[in-house]
Amino acid sequence: MKTLTIIPSRLSATRLPGKPLLKINNLSIISHVFKRAQEANIGDVIVAAEDQEIVDDVIKNGGSAILTGKNHKTGTDRIYEAFKKLELKDVDLIMNLQGDEPAINIEDITNLNTKMVSNQSKMGTLAAKIKDLKDLDNENIVKVVTKEDLNKDHFSKANNFLRRSLEVENIYHHIGIYCYSTETLKKFVELNQSKNEIENRLEQLRALDLSLIHI
């Protein structure tokens, strides 16, 4: 199976505007993410950006980028526009990496890709154990509740995503990396945003409505 990694990015981020172009060791954050994705060696990588400045920066630093529209409600919608523009016919999976995570673990990328292929899943994401119970009440740390206890060799159905929780059983820190089959990506963006998704600012809740997502 062939995987394409698409990294959505924009300058007008809510928490820290302009973050993709902030420099770490003389290289922009978005270019760091691009290079980490390349190092995972799972397939081609491209940045999907709504700002020409981001496109120019990525290309200047040896990467690939495509300009998208500015009116997307989520990063996944931006990814789908980029995928359609590329007109690639031989791609099976789309890997979605967050454009503001320069220290993303390369092993996480390869592990998710491997699990998607071996389990023939429609959509997958990652989670890690919560080490500090204070994180359960931290709205900046997204949590996921799974149907079954997780281990590194097993995918489980996601039951819920949330920002605050008092639950302890089968609850994990959600890692914001996704992989979809191309058919699932299309189905996902064609769904209307749910009230739950909008109120919680978590687009992955849309996937729960179709029972698509596994951890």
Please provide the spans of the model-predicted regions:
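Conserved small/polar residues in nucleotide/adenosyl-binding loops
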Residues: 213-215
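Residues that recognize and position ribonucleotide moieties
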Residues: 14, 102, 178, 200
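N-terminal glycine-rich phosphate-binding loop and ensuing alpha1 helix
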Residues: 2-49
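Short phosphate-binding loop-to-helix
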Residues: 46, 52-111
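A C-terminal functional module that forms or caps the active site or interfaces directly
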Residues: 189-210
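Conserved core of the sugar-phosphate nucleotidyltransferase
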Residues: 105-194
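Short, structured coil segments at secondary-structure junctions
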Residues: 41, 61-62, 210
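Residues that scaffold the ATP/ADP-binding catalytic core of kinase and kinase-like folds
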Residues: 57, 82, 187-188, 207
